[in-house]
Amino acid sequence: MQTFYGKSHILHNVGLTVNEGEIVVLLGRNGAGKTTTLRSIMGLTPPREGSVNLFGTEASRMPPYKVAELGVGYVPEGRKIFANLTVEDNLRVPLARPGAWTTKRVFETFPRLAERRDNRGRQLSGGEQEMLSIARALLLNPKLLLLDEPSQGLAPLLVKEVFQIIQAMRKEGIAVLLVEQNVRVSLAIADRAYVLDDGAIVYSGAAAELASDEDRVRSMAGASAKEWAQ
């Protein structure tokens, strides 16, 4: 994919693959192009060149609602829940696709949300809001789930809880593309990893292999393309 914001060239020949039941993490410093990659896949910032192949369908020129209909769920950074609606009403918003995920199952999977089903979105903690965002995406019964910084601003115990939920997606056969700044935790649950630097893929390989390279993990926040290519 080649993606631009106006005249600014953001993504340079970015190509990645996520298989069924696989968790893939996309890492890189702030401004590397991680969120733009998710937005390009989702049709929110379409690539100017290249293709987005979703389940055998060319989707690079599809509007976001059509991408969602193909089976892509998107949990954006910042959660984007409806603050004035109750938890239960927030879960009525998505255009549900037929499948195993129903409101009943969501409440079984997220007991915190079941306990707070009558609370408004603004009354939830950051972790509960993140769970609500993920739950809404699951009601689309996605084949691919795009997650942007799900651990942002969460206490360590809540990070652990959210990541356990993400891990459970593997057993469901859902493909997960995870954008994260929490490098160690995300590498611990991922099958494979990509690293973006200045809009280009500079590392692609097994997550465990990257996690074992302490120097590279430590330098992740300021990694340069030259360093990652070594």
Task: Please place each PLM-identified region on the residue numbering.
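ABC ATPase C-loop
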Residues: 137-138
